[in-house]
């Protein structure tokens, strides 16, 4: 059995790998503290926690395919009790997530019952250049299957996603793998099918509890796999007092004064993503107003 020191060395890491004799590329990611930090800010129902974990892993795997600096947003909108689930991640593997719930969500509620009539939207935003947005119908039982379909339709590349959420040693964990035929056309369907068949045998405890190198050896011990250095993954919200101040400046002085009157002379702004509070008293508000152009 792998000891704790061994398995934790790859907590909150993303790896890329290539098969030396088959034109297929792969990625592996595991979210431990990153996932826990996300869940600690809200009391989400269990089914929503699992969905966010699945979306976070998918977003990490998607951003790892970017060939440029930028970010990807994976967003679900619907008219069911889960109104919104949103994950944003960038090429530095900094990620954040949030959900909005309006209604009762049971532990084993299906994706379709949670969302109702809804869509999955993927937005790719390079730091330089135009944004790309794809809208995907939620016509599959899981987000993972919907995203596999997205890859086939948008990139015309055979892609396998394996994503699992759960607990390991009593703590929340989300992990996943991506296999994709190389875009240069050198890969064969037979090679891809062979590797995906092996990947499909992976067990939850292996994804959650093994270092990447050992996991890949167990799955592909007859293959030559080139494993590249890991990239750290972390929860990163990006909120700040400055951004909260800018948000306040978007409303009129009259509206600000009304809010101050209703809240006994101060405004408490809470970040929806990480839960951080930003307090503005009357003096700070007056100073802020004076900066208006």
Swiss-Prot record:
Where in the cell is the protein located?
Cytoplasm
Its gene is hslO
Record keyword Cytoplasm present: yes
GO CC aspect terms:
cytoplasm
Q: Name one Pfam family in it.
A: HSP33
Q: Which CDD domains match?
A: Hsp33
Record PTM: Under oxidizing conditions two disulfide bonds are formed involving the reactive cysteines. Under reducing conditions zinc is bound to the reactive cysteines and the protein is inactive.
UniProt lists the family membership as follows:
Belongs to the HSP33 family.
One of the protein's GO biological processes: protein refolding
User: What species is this protein from?
Assistant: Haemophilus influenzae (strain 86-028NP)
Q: Which UniProt keywords apply?
A: Chaperone, Cytoplasm, Disulfide bond, Redox-active center, Zinc
Q: What job does the chain carry out?
A: Redox regulated molecular chaperone. Protects both thermally unfolding and oxidatively damaged proteins from irreversible aggregation. Plays an important role in the bacterial defense system toward oxidative stress.
Record protein name field: 33 kDa chaperonin
InterPro entries listed in its UniProt record: Heat_shock_Hsp33 (IPR000397), Heat_shock_Hsp33_C (IPR016154), Heat_shock_Hsp33_N (IPR016153), Hsp33_helix_hairpin_bin_dom_sf (IPR023212)
Query: What molecular function terms (GO) are annotated for this protein?
Result: protein folding chaperone; unfolded protein binding
Q: Has keyword NADP?
A: no
* Disulphide connectivity of cysteines: 237-239, 271-274
Q: Which HAMAP family match?
A: HslO
Q: Where are the transmembrane segments?
A: none
